[in-house]
C-alpha cells in the first residue's frame, strides 16, 4: 500500500481520482434516496420516473463535482479526517442542496424531500468513506507494527503522540495504552485504554511486552517529573521524553528524544537576567581563554547571543579552536548569529607571558573569561610541575596582563576541588584564587572567580567514560561505592558564569548552587538502564578504589568564607578574604625556585599544599 501512495502517478492524479470517487458516492446516494422514497418498489411508473431523472443526472453530477472541488474536499488527507474536513463536506452538500432545490422548484422534476434526503446521504457516505479508509489504514499499520509502546500521560501530549505514531511510519510502534493518575484509570483515549497509574509502569510493561515508553507529561512539578523519570528508567526499557522547542517560525514544536542523564539530575531552572549580562557584553570586545574546551566553547556559544562587537577565542588546541570557529561561520551563513560579530581565533599558550601581554595590548578586550586550565586529577598528581606552570603561573600571566593593560572585567573559572584540596589540581586552583584576591584593583578592574563542581559531558569526565564502557559491553568502573559529586550541565554552568560576571566587583569568589550531590554508583546504574540494560545482569558495576588525591565528597566553600545571596537564587558570593599580596608573591617565587631546582613530585606537592593553608 505504501508503494502505491508514493508512486508518481498517484501523486499526480490524486485530486482527480478522489473527485471521481466522490462523484460516484454522490450518484450512489441519489439512487439510494430515490429507492427509499419509493419504498424500494419498482413498477412501470417508477421506471418512467427513473428515465426522467436520468435526464438531469449529468447536471447533478457536474454540479457536485464543481462544488466539492471548490470546497477542496479532494485536497484533504483521508488519514487525517477531522473537524475541518467534516465542515467542508457539510457545506458542499448544503450548497448543492440549495442549488438543486432552486432548479427543482423551476422544473418540478422531483421533490425537495428527495433532494434533502439525497444530500444527507451524500454527507454521510462521503464522510463514511473517509472514516472507513482511516480505520483500514490504522488496521494495516497495527499489523505491520509488532513493537508495543506505552504512553505516560493521557492528556493533550499523549493524544498528539498517539496520532503521530499512527500517521507516521517512522514510529514502528503499536500503542497498547496509556498511564496516568488514578482518576483516569479505566477511561479511554482515542480507542486506547488508560491501563493504570504511573506507579504501575513496571508491572504493565512486563504484562504487555512493552518495548518503548513515551513520556508526554510536561505540566508537573520538577519533583513529580523526577519521580516519573525514575519509575520509567527503572524498567530498563528504552524511554523517550517529549520536548517543546521554538522553531524558526516562532511557533512551538514537539519532538521526542531519548532520556539523557541530565534529565535524571533534577536540576533547577535558571532565571537569567539577560539585561544585566547584556550590559557588560553587548558591543564589547570579549576574550575567552581555553575557548576550545568544554566550558570555554560553551561560554563562546552563549556570549554570541549578547552581540559583542568582537569575540577573541584563545587556546593552545588548534583543532578544537578551528572547529569552534567553523561552527560559528556556519551559524553566520544560516543567519543564526549577528553577522557583524568579528571572530578571532588565536593559538596562544597562557604560559607565554609576553604573548598574553601582546594579546591584551593589541586587542584591548573589555571582558576576559579565563577558562584555560589543566583539570584531570590523576594526570596532575603524576605531573605536579605541569599543573603548577599552567594553572598557577599561566593564570598569573593572564591576571597580571589584565591589571596592567586596563581590562575592565576579569572572570576566572574555578572548581569545588579548590575547597580544602587533597590533590594537586585543586591546590593549584586554590592558589589562583588567592593570587586573584591579593591583587590591587584600584585601577578599576572588576575581578571574580566562579567556583562549581563537575559538568556533565565535559571532555574526559565520568559521563562519556561510562557511555564508552557501556557501549563496549564491559564493566562500568566506579572508584568507590559511596563517592558523591556535584553535577550541572555545561550550558547551565556557562550561563551562570555569565550571570556571575555581572556581579563581579572586587575579587569575589562566587559559588554556584549545584543542587544535591549525586552518588556516582547510582549514576552508573541509571546510565546502564538508559541503555536498555540491567545492572548486574547485562553489565556489572565494579568498584576499583579511590585514585591518588581523590576525595569521597566535594565541598563548595571553606568554613571561614562567609556566604551571601545574590539576586539570583543559584549564585552565592563569598566575601573576599584579606590576603597579603607580598606574601602570595613570595610563595610563588619560592615555588618557582623549587621547580627549577628539583623534579621531586612529593616535595613539590608538599610545598604547594603548605602554601595554600589559610
Please report, for each region that a protein language model flagged, where it lies by residue.
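Flexible, Lys/Arg-rich cytosolic regulatory linkers and terminal tails that connect or flank
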Residues: 225-287, 403
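Signature of alpha-helical transmembrane segments in polytopic membrane proteins
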Residues: 1-145, 173, 234, 241
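Strand-loop microenvironment adjacent to phosphate/nucleotide-handling motifs in alpha/beta enzyme folds
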Residues: 7, 14, 271, 276-280, ...
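Conserved Rossmann-fold NAD(P)-dependent oxidoreductase catalytic core, especially the SDR/UDP-sugar
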Residues: 249-251, 370, 376-377, 382-433
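NAD(P)-cofactor binding segment of oxidoreductase domains
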Residues: 226-240, 310-317, 361-362, 382-409
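A solvent-exposed beta-alpha-beta segment
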Residues: 27, 133-240, 316-325, 330, ...
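N-terminal Rossmann NAD(P)H-binding glycine-rich loop of SDR-like oxidoreductase domains
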Residues: 286-302
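Conserved Rossmann-fold cofactor-binding substructure of NAD(P)-dependent oxidoreductases
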Residues: 347-366
Amino acid at each position: 500500500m505504501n508503494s502505491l501512495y508514493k508512486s508518481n502517478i498517484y501523486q499526480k492524479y490524486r485530486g482527480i481520482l478522489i473527485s471521481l470517487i466522490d462523484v460516484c458516492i454522490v450518484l450512489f446516494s441519489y439512487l439510494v434516496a430515490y429507492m427509499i422514497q419509493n419504498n424500494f418498489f419498482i413498477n412501470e411508473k417508477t421506471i418512467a420516473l427513473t428515465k426522467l431523472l436520468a435526464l438531469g443526472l449529468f447536471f447533478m453530477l457536474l454540479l457536485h463535482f464543481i462544488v466539492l472541488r471548490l470546497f477542496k474536499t479532494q485536497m484533504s488527507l483521508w488519514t487525517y479526517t477531522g473537524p475541518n474536513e467534516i465542515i467542508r463536506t457539510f457545506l458542499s452538500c448544503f450548497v448543492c442542496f440549495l442549488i438543486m432545490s432552486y432548479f427543482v422548484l423551476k422544473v418540478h422534476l422531483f421533490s425537495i424531500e428527495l433532494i434533502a434526503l439525497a444530500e444527507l446521504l451524500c454527507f454521510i457516505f462521503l464522510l463514511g468513506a473517509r472514516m472507513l479508509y482511516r480505520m483500514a489504514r490504522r488496521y494495516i499499520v497495527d499489523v505491520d507494527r509488532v513493537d508495543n509502546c506505552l504512553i505516560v500521560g493521557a492528556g493533550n501530549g499523549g493524544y498528539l503522540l498517539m496520532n503521530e505514531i499512527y500517521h507516521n511510519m517512522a514510529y514502528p510502534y503499536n500503542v497498547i495504552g496509556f498511564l496516568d493518575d488514578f482518576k483516569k484509570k479505566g477511561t479511554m483515549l482515542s480507542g486506547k485504554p488508560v491501563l493504570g497509574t504511573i506507579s504501575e509502569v513496571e508491572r504493565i510493561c512486563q504484562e504487555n511486552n512493552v518495548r518503548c515508553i513515551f513520556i508526554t507529561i510536561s505540566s508537573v512539578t520538577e519533583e513529580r517529573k523526577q519521580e516519573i523519570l525514575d519509575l520509567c528508567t527503572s524498567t530498563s526499557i528504552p524511554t523517550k521524553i517529549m520536548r517543546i522547542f521554538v522553531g524558526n517560525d516562532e511557533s512551538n514544536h514537539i519532538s521526542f528524544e531519548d532520556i539523557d542523564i541530565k534529565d535524571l539530575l533534577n536540576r533547577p531552572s535558571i532565571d537569567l537576567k539577560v539585561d544585566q549580562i547584556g550590559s557588560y557584553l553587548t558591543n564589547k570586545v570579549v576574550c575567552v581563554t581555553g575557548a576550545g574546551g568544554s566550558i570555554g566553547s560553551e561560554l563562546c556559544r552563549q556570549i554570541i547571543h549578547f552581540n559583542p562587537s568582537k569575540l577573541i577565542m584563545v587556546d593552545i588546541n588548534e583543532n578544537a579552536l578551528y572547529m569552534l570557529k567553523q561552527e560559528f561561520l556556519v551559524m553566520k551563513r544560516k543567519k543564526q548569529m549577528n553577522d557583524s560579530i568579528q571572530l578571532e581565533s588565536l593559538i596562544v599558550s597562557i604560559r607565554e607571558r609576553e604573548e598574553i601581554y601582546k594579546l591584551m595590548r593589541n586587542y584591548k578586550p573589555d571582558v576576559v573569561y579565563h577558562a584555560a586550565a589543566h583539570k584531570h586529577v590523576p594526570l596532575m598528581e603524576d605531573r605536579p610541575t605541569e599543573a603548577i606552570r599552567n594553572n598557577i603561573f599561566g593564570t598569573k600571566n593572564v591576571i597580571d596582563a589584565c591589571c596592567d593593560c586596563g581590562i575592565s572585567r576579569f572572570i576566572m573559572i574555578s572548581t569545588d576541588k579548590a575547597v580544602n584540596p587533597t590533590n594537586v589540581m585543586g591546590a593549584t586552583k586554590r592558589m589562583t584564587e588567592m593570587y586573584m584576591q591579593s591583587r590591587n584593583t584600584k585601577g578599576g578592574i572588576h575581578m571574580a572567580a566562579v567556583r562549581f563542581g563537575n559538568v556533565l559531558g565535559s571532555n574526559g569526565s565520568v559521563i562519556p567514560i561510562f557511555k564508552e564502557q557501556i557501549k563496549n559491553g564491559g564493566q562500568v568502573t566506579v572508584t568507590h561505592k559511596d563517592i558523591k559529586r556535584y553535577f550541572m550541565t555545561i550550558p547551565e554552568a556557562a550561563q551562570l558564569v555569565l550571570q556571575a560576571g555581572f556581579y563581579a566587583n572586587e575579587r569575589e569568589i562566587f559559588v554556584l548552587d549545584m543542587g544535591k550531590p549525586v552518588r556516582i554508583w547510582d549514576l552508573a546504574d541509571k546510565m546502564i538502564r538508559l541503555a536498555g540494560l540491567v545492572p548486574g545482569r547485562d553489565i556489572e558495576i565494579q568498584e576499583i578504589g579511590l585514585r591518588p588525591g581523590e576525595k569521597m565528597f566535594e565541598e563548595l566553600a571553606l568554613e571561614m568564607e562567609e556566604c551571601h545571596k545574590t539576586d539570583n537564587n543559584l549564585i552565592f558570593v563569598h566575601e573576599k578574604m584579606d590576603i597579603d599580596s607580598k606574601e602570595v608573591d613570595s610563595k610563588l617565587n619560592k615555588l618557582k625556585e623549587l621547580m627549577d631546582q628539583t623534579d621531586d613530585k612529593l616535595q613539590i606537592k608538599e610545598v604547594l599544599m603548605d602554601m595554600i593553608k589559610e
